[in-house]
């Protein structure tokens, strides 16, 4: 009987640790384009856990790219970029922005979590944001159109 109780307690602790550990930070997206996975850096976020909540304000997306030394994934003009999360964001909350050289941003239209990259050659920095029941989060990535 004692062994059963210890085993049950160990299972509860393990499951609880996995559950709470996986909910401490926002989910990270998987971004793919032309069979390549794009490296993504965490941007600003606010997230609520069971015990605490935190908001973290990050530097600008171009500075995040420099800080994390992210290299652009080289893609074809007008390639389709797919954004997926292991935990689905709230409906109609996924947004993308293209960062311009003057520090301004413009909306990057998404259709079913797919973004079409520009046809002009160049390096493009994008930020993506979404909301969940536990909070909101932003992410940054860079691509190069050849």
Predicted regions and their residues:
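Edge beta-strands of extracellular beta-sandwich domains
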Residues: 29, 136-146
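Mature extracytoplasmic domains of secretory-pathway proteins
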Residues: 47-104
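Hydrophobic membrane-insertion alpha-helices, especially the h-region
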Residues: 5-19
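N-terminal export/targeting and maturation segments
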Residues: 15-57
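Surface-exposed, short loops/turns at beta-strand junctions within beta-sandwich domains
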Residues: 115-125, 133
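Short beta-strand segments within Ig-like beta-sandwich modules, predominantly Fibronectin type-III
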Residues: 104-111
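Surface-exposed coil/turn segments at beta-strand junctions on protein surfaces, enriched
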Residues: 74-76, 110, 119-121
